[in-house]
């Protein structure tokens, strides 16, 4: 009765079952996996956020497949102001309700069934579901760690085939927190020319460079057909206000044809609503209030982790440049999932095992840096004591 593309293993995994049991017991859990800023004690002024939704213009229905010009202009202003992309035209944008929807639009644009998308490893578990729903095959290429993360270009070229349609980049990567360097960008553009592929670049964490130095956006990349995905879920810590987008850049003719086809896809669904689009200028401007708060927390939690690690030499953290996560390296005496389960049962600490993100082996735990500082400090202390024991 049901399609093969939705034939997923739907039963809860062991870690989820243990988490449910520990919660049911009433014991306090030190959750180091928090990804929702609205549950991390970080909030914008509700009067400003909700007030932006009260706009008489929203009573009029004006279906624009690419999105209302007011919203697209606000996104262009964000790129000019935050990332010095000065020549972005609103017509290069397609608004979506989420980056997941944006991925599905781009996959449908580029791929026939069983075509291939090259995806970094480690990275988002979400890609597998998005690929399944679009009948696309994922082929991984590794990021290698050597005093920081780099793309393994030898493996990228080996992974490519005549069915390759695009390379996914996450800039900065989740969970490694590594940005794509200028040298890597040049090499990726050359790869795209060699294989007639596009770049799909997820920049949801772009603004969260831990050193405070703005990183360049691929929205200004003109050397290969590039689809840059982002949204206010992370930029303004507003995941509940569904606004994301695709920026198409690259060779002029390819950009024009891609935009025309994306417009038809967007017109087929017309998923954007008027109140959110009209509020886009206010929502994007709120990043100026929330990002400094989040960056202070990211840095404080990272500093606290480093201080505690001084007393636990068996554990180390991997270098991280940006984003909301950090990777902890622990002795690989058991599987990451088994360790995460025992941490929950015996220390009430919740972490993500590395295999959730396709790390190359055991001994990796992924921690959220937006966790409230008191919870983070105590959770790390419990984790390190448990591993040491």
What is the role of each PLM region?
Residues 25, 134, 194-195, 347:
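Helix C-cap/helix->beta junction micro-motif
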Residues 154-157, 342-351, 357-389:
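PLP-dependent enzyme catalytic core of the Aspartate aminotransferase-like
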Residues 88-90, 319-324, 362:
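Short Gly/Ser/Thr- and Asp/Glu-enriched loop/turn motifs at secondary-structure junctions
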Residues 220, 224-299, 307, 387:
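Conserved core segment of the aminotransferase class I/II
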Residues 203:
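Walker B catalytic acidic pair
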Residues 281, 297-306, 316-330:
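Conserved glycine-rich beta-strand-loop-beta hairpin in the small C-terminal domain of fold type I
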Residues 2-98, 105, 155, 283-286, ...:
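N-terminal small-domain helix-loop-helix segment of the aminotransferase-like
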Residues 58-190, 194, 206-221, 227, ...:
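Conserved core of the PLP fold type I
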